[in-house]
Amino acid sequence: MGIKFLEFIKPFCAVLPEIQKPERKIQFREKVLWTAITLFIFLVCCQIPLFGIMSSDSADPFYWMRVILASNRGTLMELGISPIVTSGLIMQLLAGAKIIEVGDTPKDRALFNGAQKLFGMIITIGQAIVYVMTGMYGDPSEMGAGICLLIIIQLFVAGLIVLLLDELLQKGYGLGSGISLFIATNICETIVWKAFSPTTVNTGRGTEFEGAIIALFHLLATRTDKVRALREAFYRQNLPNILNLIATVFVFAVVIYFQGFRVDLPIKSARYRGQYNTYPIKLFYTSNIPIILQSALVSNLYVISQMLSTRFSGNFLVNLLGTWSDATSGGPARAYPVAGLCYYLSPPESFGSVLDDPVHAAIYIVFMLGSCAFFSKTWIEVSGSSAKDVAKQLKEQQMVMRGHRETSMVHELNRYIPTAAAFGGLCIGGLSVMADFLGAIGSGTGILLAVTIIYQYFEIFVKEQSEMGSMGALLF
């Protein structure tokens, strides 16, 4: 059934725009250049406002998710990477449930990737329509059909650009993937801004700076009671404070520490005697994929809940999914869930919120740990990183595990890889929850994504350096 499904969509995949694989090896300097160009295009799109919108000042239901989804309110990057990640989530669940079967051949993998791209474009159109029709840019009846269509076209073209930029890097022209690059850039930008923002906010205590570090020096300079000034700088509510910054640095350090956890399986060459090596199985075997897919799941649930609550406010089933309230204190207007399923799947705002509503905290912990472990374990089956796939790769390289025949390698790898995937996903979820409870800037999920992505780029850089010979050869 799976192959028939992939064959069915093959004609549609043929008309999709595609980046061709490079015909030659791309040098490191060229990869850096293409990565920089990709990032520049993304940042420019983040600053270009959508033409035709009447207003983008309404409460933002996706405020908490924008950092993770690399989206920017009211701009071409309104949707961010959400369509790509959502299509990946859908295809993974379909493949994991054996509704579609993905073979080991390059043809099947190419069809699977094409189907993912096709779904990404369909989801882009769907999300654009939902955003416009729910009144995020003004009343659709007042804007008119022409303006609504124009906004949808802009969002679709921007979504297509993101898809192609991601494919450009994944095909080998740049470093890493577009999704990772955009997420890390957005999160790091948010952390730096929350630490050093010169924007002033009027609070009940007077005018304060948004940036935590600037606010610290401002409060010390303007308050006569220095102890009280320090207390305000460390514990102030609704604005970034020094404790949030310390929690962020602490989570960075913890995640980097866990990145080094791995099991090295001894392997040897089947062709040359005396040639030994190791195959590392990391604790974070599937890296940040579980948390990205979990974020996509929650963000789409938010979209559906917000759309239904706008149209059918007061309906029992809609309220069961989520009820929303607006908040404007300490920043831009944002909508947040106050009851229903969406509320229990959203992170508590602080450790104080955990104590106020322990049931909310408990459900959130179970959801985060369970979903991350599930996504991590199912991802290895569709991404070519299962025990069977690894054994096949080792066999192609004429490597075998020491003390095991080729036929028993899959069984031995099965002892480690599924466990590492599930436990690694569990740890990813646990670290994200810890960061949320500590109040880290950019959300626990955001911090975790930033660290894992930066670490991935560090590993890519080291790999390129070893291939080129020296850092001097890399840069000059």
Curated annotation (Swiss-Prot):
Keyword vocabulary terms for this entry: Developmental protein, Endoplasmic reticulum, Membrane, Protein transport, Translocation, Transmembrane, Transmembrane helix, Transport
A GO cellular component entry from the record: endoplasmic reticulum membrane
Topology in the lipid bilayer: Multi-pass membrane protein
Chain ranges on the Lumenal side, renumbered to this chain: 54-76, 139-144, 194-240, 310-354, 442-445
GO biological process assignments: pronephric nephron development; protein targeting to ER; protein transport
Quaternary data: The SEC61 channel-forming translocon complex consists of channel-forming core components SEC61A1, SEC61B and SEC61G and different auxiliary components such as SEC62 and SEC63. The SEC61 channel associates with the multi-pass translocon (MPT) complex.
Protein's name according to its UniProt entry: Protein transport protein Sec61 subunit alpha
Species the sequence originates in: Notothenia angustata
Upper taxonomic lineage: Eukaryota, Metazoa, Chordata, Craniata, Vertebrata
